[in-house]
């Protein structure tokens, strides 16, 4: 079988994944949650919302250095406390196909499953396919995927070259 070619791969730094499920007021909860992150200068590396059979879910990932704040925030909000799951440490593995092929999604899921690599989340677009995995499984995932997908080692961004942080400094 021919390998599927992709344009590149990106691995994130160590993250914390937060799942908020079965939310009564998703818009209000998401708005307040995002406001709390913004007020505390915390950037989200990943955000996804979905609704299945009337149940709402928000999944987001933030830098692991914010783990303490996230845990405190969830403990302080009754709506969050009873509907949250925190998974850490996690990381994002993003594949950049030349053209999106459904075959790449199926093949990736099959390879990760056969390698017993837990999948905590997934998002896709025309230009990328992103998996939330245990942080310590990122390199193993690349190795396993490399057996079925043509990955140029030169096009693997192992960690972000630039880290962006928010600042309270105001323009004068």
Provide a role label for each language-model segment.
Residues 1-172:
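A conserved regulatory-domain signal marking ACT and ACT-like small-molecule sensing domains
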């Amino acid at each position: 079988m021919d390998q599927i070619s992709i344009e590149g791969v990106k691995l994130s730094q160590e993250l914390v994944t937060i799942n908020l499920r079965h939310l009564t007021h998703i818009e209000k909860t998401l708005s307040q949650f995002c406001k709390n992150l913004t007020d505390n200068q915390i950037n989200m590396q990943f955000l996804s919302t979905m609704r299945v059979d009337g149940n709402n879910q928000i999944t987001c990932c933030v830098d692991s250095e914010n783990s303490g704040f996230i845990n405190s925030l969830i403990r302080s909000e009754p709506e969050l406390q009873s509907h949250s799951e925190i998974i850490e440490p996690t990381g994002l593995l993003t594949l950049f196909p030349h053209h999106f092929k459904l075959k790449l999604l199926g093949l990736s899921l099959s390879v990760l499953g056969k390698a017993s690599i837990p999948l905590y989340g997934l998002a896709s677009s025309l230009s990328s396919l992103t998996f939330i995995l245990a942080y310590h499984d990122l390199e193993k995932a690349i190795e396993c995927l490399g057996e079925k997908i043509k990955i140029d080692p030169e096009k693997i961004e192992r960690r972000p070259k630039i880290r962006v942080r928010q600042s309270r400094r105001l323009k004068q």
